[in-house]
């Protein structure tokens, strides 16, 4: 009995250290051999919440006492404290008891039967996946060290895979292909933009553990095969693709008729700004008289990369965006002449002083919207220093910023929303998007948006 009392005392002490609300009595869970089943855990947690007996942290200590012995409480609570101090979205964190119950139920439903409950790391990962899933931020992710390395590799522009760019469709809980790299493995196998990935190697997304895990299954060693199941306009299709080493080019360009420079930016990755510079230099050498920047289906990427590219277009010391962390004063990014390392840097105070047109659509999001809104604001909203017309459709409307925080002991990370951001005009567009100057709906039979962009560039040149 003394041992049990010491155990309970230790649990209470740990709860006091990490809890942000009043400490309440935690009853002895009894005989774990008899009661440590997922049904008992679920029932006891639900009863706990209904009776308002415990605060948020207590539920997890209670869960541990009911038979899930080996999760890393220090790691879990470290991440919880990061969320509490930094999370800045909507009304903030949800009600702690409700969130706790949802997290436990999600853990039981999705992980309890599929993990080794004696594996400390596996249990902790599962709890943190569930924690983040239920926080209320659709842009929040928990990643293990391996998953985070894969994520960084993807944003570096080099990775092993099949040559597609995707985004998570939250409404349909599936993965939308928004770009297929020309002449890549997926392109050769027949995958298309607009396909919805619903399975990999015979397993559904739920069976794979969700969005991030599904992406990890698509990737693999070059030369190996993967079968991707897609929904194409209601038809279920299995397509086998042979993986290859993918070096992604996020910027493509060409000189159109009348010497109109066309630059397509598919995402904002580590190597995108350098590629953009090369594209502009090449088109300048070809005598471009104006530019069309195409950011349709661009889901965003690194804010810093968007700032670097804008720095190559606008003069120095122009505000690009402002943002504000929880409890802190407002900060801002400005254009600069030394934004990248020297080996691929934007050297010198380069300015594009030719007419410009941007093409955007409903999948232009996040950092891509920073690009659109900042240039728009310098066409008369805050200063009138460029000639610009925006063509296409209303953008996605993601006017928030996510940051990533790591746990140094094992390399895992959490990413979640930390601030809203505003373009130079200081008008946030989250949930609203950016309206084009000239609305043109995309037509699958042709590219009416590009045709109109060419028309608008001609108008600007003839003013």
PLM region spans:
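Terminal peptide-recognition signature
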Residues: 59, 127, 131, 164, ...
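Conserved PDZ fold ligand-binding element
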Residues: 84-85, 186-210, 291-294, 378, ...
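Bacterial signal peptide processing site
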Residues: 24-27
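Gly/Ser/Thr-rich loop/hinge elements
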Residues: 150-152, 236, 247-251, 300-359, ...
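PDZ/PDZ-like domain segments forming the peptide/carboxylate-binding groove
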Residues: 147, 155-199, 203-207, 269-273, ...
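Extended, small/polar residue-biased N-terminal targeting/export presequences
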Residues: 53, 64-171, 225-226, 233-240, ...
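C-terminal, low-ordered peptide segments at domain boundaries
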Residues: 181, 187-192, 199-289, 311, ...
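C-terminal motif of bacterial Sec signal peptides marking the signal peptidase cleavage site
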Residues: 19-22
């Amino acid at each position: 009995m003394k041992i049990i009392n010491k155990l309970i005392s230790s649990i209470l002490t740990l709860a006091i250290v990490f809890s942000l609300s009043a400490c309440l009595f935690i009853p002895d869970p009894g005989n774990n051999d008899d009661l440590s089943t997922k049904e008992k855990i679920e029932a006891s947690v639900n009863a706990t919440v209904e009776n308002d007996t415990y605060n948020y942290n207590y539920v997890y200590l209670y869960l541990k006492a009911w038979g899930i012995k080996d999760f890393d409480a220090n790691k879990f609570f470290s991440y919880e404290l990061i969320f509490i101090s930094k999370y800045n979205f909507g009304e903030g964190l949800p009600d702690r008891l409700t969130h706790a119950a949802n997290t436990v139920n999600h853990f039981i439903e999705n992980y309890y039967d599929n993990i080794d409950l004696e594996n400390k790391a596996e249990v902790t990962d599962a709890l943190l996946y569930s924690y983040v899933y239920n926080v209320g931020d659709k842009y929040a992710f928990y990643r293990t060290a391996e998953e985070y390395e894969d994520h960084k590799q993807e944003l570096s522009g080099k990775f092993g895979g099949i040559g597609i760019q995707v985004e998570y469709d939250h409404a349909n809980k599936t993965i939308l292909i928004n770009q297929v790299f020309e002449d890549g493995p997926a392109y050769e196998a027949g995958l298309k933009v607009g396909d919805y990935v619903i399975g990999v190697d015979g397993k559904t997304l739920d069976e794979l553990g969700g969005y991030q895990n599904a992406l990890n299954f698509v990737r693999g060693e070059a030369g190996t095969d993967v079968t991707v199941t897609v929904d194409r306009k209601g038809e279920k299709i299995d397509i086998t693709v042979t993986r290859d080493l993918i070096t992604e080019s996020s910027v493509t360009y060409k000189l159109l008729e009348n010497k109109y420079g066309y630059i397509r930016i598919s995402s904002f990755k580590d190597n995108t700004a350098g590629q953009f510079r090369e594209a502009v230099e090449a088109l300048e050498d070809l005598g471009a008289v104006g530019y069309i920047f195409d950011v349709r289906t661009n889901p965003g990427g690194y804010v810093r990369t968007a700032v670097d590219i804008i720095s190559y277009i606008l003069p120095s010391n122009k505000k690009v965006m402002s943002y504000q962390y929880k409890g802190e004063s407002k900060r801002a990014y400005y254009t600069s002449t030394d934004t990248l390392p020297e080996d691929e840097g934007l050297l010198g105070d380069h300015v594009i002083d030719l007419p410009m047109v941007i093409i955007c659509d409903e999948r232009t999001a996040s950092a891509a919207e920073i690009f659109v809104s900042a240039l728009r604001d310098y066409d008369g909203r805050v200063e009138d220093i460029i000639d610009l017309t925006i063509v296409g459709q209303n953008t996605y409307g993601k006017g928030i910023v996510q940051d990533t925080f790591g746990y140094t002991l094992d390399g895992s990370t959490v990413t979640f929303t930390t601030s809203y951001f505003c373009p130079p005009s200081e008008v946030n567009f989250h949930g609203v998007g950016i309206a084009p100057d000239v609305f043109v709906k995309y037509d699958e039979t042709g590219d009416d948006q590009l045709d109109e962009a060419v028309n608008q560039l001609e108008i600007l040149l003839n003013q």
